[in-house]
């Protein structure tokens, strides 16, 4: 008998009920009792949905008010001093203060904890803050309360914990530099393990038989001391009187396989979607008493599982393992939308190819039933439907476009190279553009006012004509241009009033994308995103931005910059196809964007920015796999940017905090100008560019757009002087960290006035020095 179980379920609700309740609570429109009631309703509904889909062992503890890592920080008492409530007891407001830097009755104006990507997903977690003298204690009982809830409903359950090694790995040491630089956070393990033991003992006392302990870092390159720590930790935790399933996901175990197989636990979950090659090896290495859970259904994408293919593996495993076989999605379904059945307006053919969280649970259950009762009528019907879907999708003319494939096949090496090297190009560009030293610009977007959003909503709902919508957006463009001219910026942007999202705006105009109404997934806290779905070969039927940018250029004699989203970012922030490699999809996107770049150039646009915000996010978890990814990601950017003349200047923008390990690839992109987020690091990130001797122009962000604070001119001058120590002054641009979409106009204008003043001050100082 194969057990159908699940590692985790989306917590936001099919209608984003959690998001709405959280935001109502933060605004004071919903009290804590009301918020907790929404949480209970969602948990009960989600457990029932999984049960109805055929899941036998339900996850408990996958729900979180904001983030599962943050919930663990509260449970273990990892609450930074600035958030500790005076009365000593952690509350929901404590949790939200840690996440948002805001609380209604405590903690003052404390800065929120750092947030970063959860491995290589688009989910973000709150980074635990450890101190050298960190103590751990059981401080938050939400998990135990949820266990009682589920038991009261009569469910068979499996509580979910983040394992002690992964939890420590995900955190950061905070405090005095002289202490944190010499202290290894792994030394905290012995202090943390007793609290884990206490949690496990308490779960056992509640009658829990199995607990799932997530250790996703087993899919990473681990130092030897961390590998050794795994054995020590789980030797101690084996004393707890309940069964433990260690769950790994997002990649293969590789050199950690032997370690994972021999840990003193009762079961192991492996991801066979990301790493199918590990199956035969783990089967041979797993001790005969252990359960093996196979992740055969993709928990991170939206495509239906090929049930015949998955069943072939499951049947083989059943022959070897018998009742020790469990089946599950590859990872938590947190990364999947909730329920495909809500999509009442989705193209029926494309819809037949998809599966969201509820449907993925059904697929897992079908596989388990197919092991136990292969002739079951429902099983046979499900397998027949799966075969029909796979065949229809493989043959669909909507997916496979001969013209796109012919164009891909015709790509030559020269298509990914500019005509001349940067040193030649930059002289031609400077002669054409006639910009001053320290040229000023912005990253692209200006404030999205309520009026802009209402106009776009009315247009999409058919309440505003195309003509009236165009007129409204043109008025916003005229306003943005006038403001920039008045401030004195050198290179202007049109402000992107017509764009709701930097990916969706372009995806809506490309063939090969489809969009959902309810395909929301959690990004962090109450923020949800609705990624577009790439279902077929990608192409651009017509220009996407040219009319808007041309109109903006007509409003000014100054240089207007075209604004596009790059192919890698388009791919990373979409649900990608599974039937062709990601690099093929990136090339298709690159060709579509290349056409837009060339059309912008033909329209007289002299500077074109191609944003690659997600370039680094695509890096595989294992460093040995980086080179392949970086090669095709760089090639995709160059392919979209290399169709223009030397005189046309190509910019790119990246907004993340680590460049050292990818600086060669960033240089290989060969953008004429790269703008980057540096203000919060006080320009320290530029050290990577100096050490590498980065050859092209750079625009280090001189102020943080994530804050409404307006920095003064002297502060920005200081940052630019610091930047000039790393980058030759003739190659420095002056710009904010990122786009200004989320800011208001008053602070935007005030900050840009000071930024332009800072650039002029540096020009004057440089002129005086030359004189």
From Swiss-Prot:
L-homocysteine binds at residues 443-445, 496, 611. Its EC number is 2.1.1.14. Pathway: Amino-acid biosynthesis; L-methionine biosynthesis via de novo pathway; L-methionine from L-homocysteine (MetE route): step 1/1. The active site is at residue 706. It is an enzyme of class 2 (transferase). CDD domains: CIMS_C_terminal_like, CIMS_N_terminal_like. InterPro entries: Cbl-indep_Met_Synth_N (IPR013215), Cobalamin-indep_Met_synthase (IPR006276), Met_Synth_C/arc (IPR002629), UROD/MetE-like_sf (IPR038071). Zn(2+) binds at residues 653, 655, 677, 738. Gene3D superfamilies: 3.20.20.210. L-methionine binds at residues 443-445, 496, 611. GO terms for molecular function: 5-methyltetrahydropteroyltriglutamate-homocysteine S-methyltransferase activity; zinc ion binding. GO terms for biological process: methionine biosynthetic process; methylation. Keywords: Amino-acid biosynthesis, Metal-binding, Methionine biosynthesis, Methyltransferase, Repeat, Transferase, Zinc. Its cofactor is Zn(2+). It holds the Pfam family Meth_synt_2. Binds 1 zinc ion per subunit. 5-methyltetrahydropteroyltri-L-glutamate binds at residues 16-19, 117, 527-528, 573, 617. It catalyses: 5-methyltetrahydropteroyltri-L-glutamate + L-homocysteine = tetrahydropteroyltri-L-glutamate + L-methionine. Belongs to the vitamin-B12 independent methionine synthase family. This is 5-methyltetrahydropteroyltriglutamate--homocysteine methyltransferase. The lineage of its organism: Bacteria, Pseudomonadati, Pseudomonadota, Gammaproteobacteria, Pseudomonadales. The gene is metE.
């Amino acid at each position: 008998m194969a057990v159908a179980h699940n590692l985790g379920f989306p917590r936001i609700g099919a209608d984003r009920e959690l998001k709405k309740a959280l935001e109502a609570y933060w605004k004071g429109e919903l009290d804590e009792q009301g918020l907790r009631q929404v949480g209970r309703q969602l948990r009960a509904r989600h457990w029932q949905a999984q049960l109805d889909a055929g899941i036998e062992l339900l996850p408990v503890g996958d729900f979180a008010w904001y983030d599962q890592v943050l919930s663990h920080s509260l449970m273990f008492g990892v609450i930074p001093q600035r958030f500790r409530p005076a009365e000593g007891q952690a509350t929901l407001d404590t949790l939200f203060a840690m996440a948002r830097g805001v609380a209604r009755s405590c903690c003052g104006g404390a800065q929120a904890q750092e947030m970063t990507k959860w491995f290589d997903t688009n989910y973000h977690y709150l980074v635990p803050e450890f101190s050298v003298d960190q103590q751990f204690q059981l401080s938050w009982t939400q998990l135990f309360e949820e266990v009682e809830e589920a038991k009261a409903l009569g469910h068979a359950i499996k509580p979910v914990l983040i394992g002690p090694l992964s939890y420590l790995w995900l955190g950061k040491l905070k405090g005095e530099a002289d202490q944190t630089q010499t202290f290894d956070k792994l030394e905290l393990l012995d202090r943390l393990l007793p609290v884990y033991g206490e949690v496990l003992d308490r779960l056992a006392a509640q009658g829990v038989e199995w607990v799932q302990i997530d250790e996703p870092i087993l899919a990473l390159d681990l130092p030897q001391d961390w590998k050794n720590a795994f054995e020590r930790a789980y030797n101690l935790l084996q004393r707890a009187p309940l069964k433990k399933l260690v769950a790994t996901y997002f990649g293969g175990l590789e050199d950690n396989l032997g370690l994972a197989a021999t840990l003193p636990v009762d079961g192991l979950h492996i991801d066979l979607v990301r790493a199918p090659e590990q199956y035969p090896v783990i089967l041979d290495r797993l001790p005969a008493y252990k359960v093996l859970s196979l992740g055969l259904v993709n928990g991170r994408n939206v495509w239906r599982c090929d049930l015949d293919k998955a069943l072939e593996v499951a049947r083989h495993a059943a022959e070897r393992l018998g009742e020790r076989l469990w089946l599950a999605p590859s990872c938590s379904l947190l990364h999947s939308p909730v329920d495909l059945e809500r999509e009442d307006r989705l193209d029926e053919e494309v819809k037949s190819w998809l599966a969201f969280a509820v449907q993925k649970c059904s697929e897992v259950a079908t596989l388990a039933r197919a092991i136990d009762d292969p002739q079951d009528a429902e099983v046979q019907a499900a397998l027949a439907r799966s075969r029909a879907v796979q065949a229809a999708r493989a043959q669909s003319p909507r997916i496979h476009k001969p013209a796109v494939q012919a164009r891909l096949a015709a790509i030559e090496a020269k298509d990914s190279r500019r005509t001349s090297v940067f040193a030649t190009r930059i002289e031609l560009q400077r002669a054409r553009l006639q910009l001053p030293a320290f040229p000023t610009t912005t990253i692209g977007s200006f404030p999205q006012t309520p009026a802009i959003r209402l106009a776009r909503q009315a247009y999409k709902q058919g309440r505003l004509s195309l003509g009236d919508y165009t007129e409204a957006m043109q008025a916003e463009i005229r306003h943005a241009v006038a403001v920039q001219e008045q401030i004195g910026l050198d290179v202007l942007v049109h402000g992107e009033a017509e764009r709701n999202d930097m990916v969706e705006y372009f995806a809506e105009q490309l063939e090969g994308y489809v969009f959902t109404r309810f395909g929301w997934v959690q990004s962090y806290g109450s923020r949800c995103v609705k990624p577009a779905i790439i279902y077929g070969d990608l192409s651009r039927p017509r220009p996407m931005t040219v009319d808007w940018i041309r109109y903006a250029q007509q409003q000014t004699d100054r240089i207007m910059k075209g604004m596009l989203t790059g192919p890698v970012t388009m791919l990373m922030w979409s649900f990608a196809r599974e039937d062709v490699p990601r690099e093929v999809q990136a090339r298709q996107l690159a060709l579509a964007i290349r056409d837009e770049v060339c059309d912008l150039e033909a329209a007289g646009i002299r500077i074109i920015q191609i944003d690659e915000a997600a370039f680094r996010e695509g890096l595989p978890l294992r460093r040995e796999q980086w080179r392949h990814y970086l090669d095709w990601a760089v090639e995709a950017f160059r392919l979209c940017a290399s169709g223009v003349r030397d005189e046309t200047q190509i910019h790119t923008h990246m907004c993340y905090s680590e460049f050292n390990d990818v600086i060669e690839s960033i240089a290989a992109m060969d953008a004429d100008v790269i703008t980057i987020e540096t203000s919060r690091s006080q320009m320290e990130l530029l050290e990577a560019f100096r050490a590498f001797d980065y050859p092209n122009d750079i625009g280090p962000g001189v102020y943080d757009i994530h804050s409404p604070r307006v920095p003064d001119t002297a502060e920005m001058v200081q940052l630019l002087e610091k930047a000039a120590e790393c980058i030759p002054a003739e190659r420095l641009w002056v710009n904010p960290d990122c786009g200004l979409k989320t800011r208001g106009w008053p602070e935007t204008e005030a900050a840009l006035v000071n930024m332009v003043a800072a650039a002029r001050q540096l020009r004057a100082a440089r002129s005086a020095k030359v004189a």
